[in-house]
Amino acid sequence: MSNDNHVHGGDPRRELKRLGLETRDVLDFSVNVSPLGVPSEIKAIWKELLAEVDRYPSVDGQGVACYYQKRFNLDPARVLAGNGSTELIYLTPRALELRKVAVITPSFHDYTRSSLAAGADLLEVELKAEEGFAPLGFDILKEVMAEADGLFVGNPNNPTSTVFPRQLLLDLAASFPNKWILVDEAFVQFLDQPEEVSLIRQEPPPENILVFHSLTKFFALPGLRLGAVVGHPDTISRLRPLKEPWSVNRVAEKVALELIKCADYEKRLSSLVCLERPRVFNRIQDISGFQPFAPAANFLLARWTLTDQLDDLLRFMLGSGVHLRDCRNFPGLQDNFFRMAIRQPEENDRVLSLMRSCSDHYL
């Protein structure tokens, strides 16, 4: 499968070239990772990790699995570690032999790519901008599940920040016990009360729900690729034999074990996002030319309305040293939508100031 359409944030050089701008240092708001950076606990052992690279990792990523077992008090049989949660998102439709997969759009493109790679047909279900990208109701999802044998749900969804109630997903799974609910919780730790949304600790675990979880975004470690899929032991046992060995490197395993010690980092990050998210949203609402949608996670989706070309905004911001995520490659977001991360207060203030300057320029 070609990677030509595998567009994502985190590549300002590509955007600088596309927009005809000179190469420069930028503040990257296009990726949704922790603004606190790598935890100090990981920085402190970084030189020691060099001694690990001449040794094989465990075959099945036990270091990463151990993090989930200790942090969330999970039975080891419920956890399958991966080279980031994306590896496991691709494994699942193939391992479960899904033939028709429902995907809520707009959402993370790899739900679609993984389903197509497994030979499945797609059923796209749209979140509507005119409804504020509100979560779909139970009756609509029942109709969807009647036609598909699996449903991918980002919770919270990227890029809309939509949150689906936990009980809704549990009720859906109970109503269709022979079909699969595949829940991507890559950003769940950024919510105000993640324990009220997450299914990772659900007891007893439904056999037809799988939860994908990532450590790379919350702990600012996207280059290491750390994640897992969590589910009923019988379901995980179906996936385990089909997952490639050695996919989690030894450094990632060692780092995962240290993340168990990062409770203070978790508290500081949660507090920061909880305070900055509503502040940034409210400030953008007051700037002409921007239509923000209420965020729940550590990122915000908005629409540029002062001109017909989103590139007018992107060029102004990038030329001033700030990279936003162009969302026009998401289904349903072609009409000048962009996404921005929630970062440190002073960084957010810089972006807000530039947005106001851009608005004044085009008014």
Task: Describe the residue ranges of each PLM region.
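PLP-dependent aminotransferase class I/II
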Residues: V38-P39, N208-D286, F290-F293
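PLP-dependent enzyme catalytic core of the Aspartate aminotransferase-like
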Residues: Q167, G319-S320, P331-L363
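Conserved PLP-anchoring active-site segment centered on the Schiff-base-forming lysine
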Residues: A95-L116
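N-terminal "arm"/small-domain region of PLP-dependent enzymes with the aminotransferase-like
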Residues: M1-R55, A146-D149
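Active-site phosphate-binding strand-loop segment of PLP-dependent enzymes
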Residues: L123, A129-L191
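Conserved small-domain helix->loop->beta segment predominantly found in fold-type I
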Residues: F281-L306, D326-D335, L363
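Conserved PLP-binding catalytic core of the aspartate aminotransferase-like
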Residues: V273-C274, I287-S320, I342
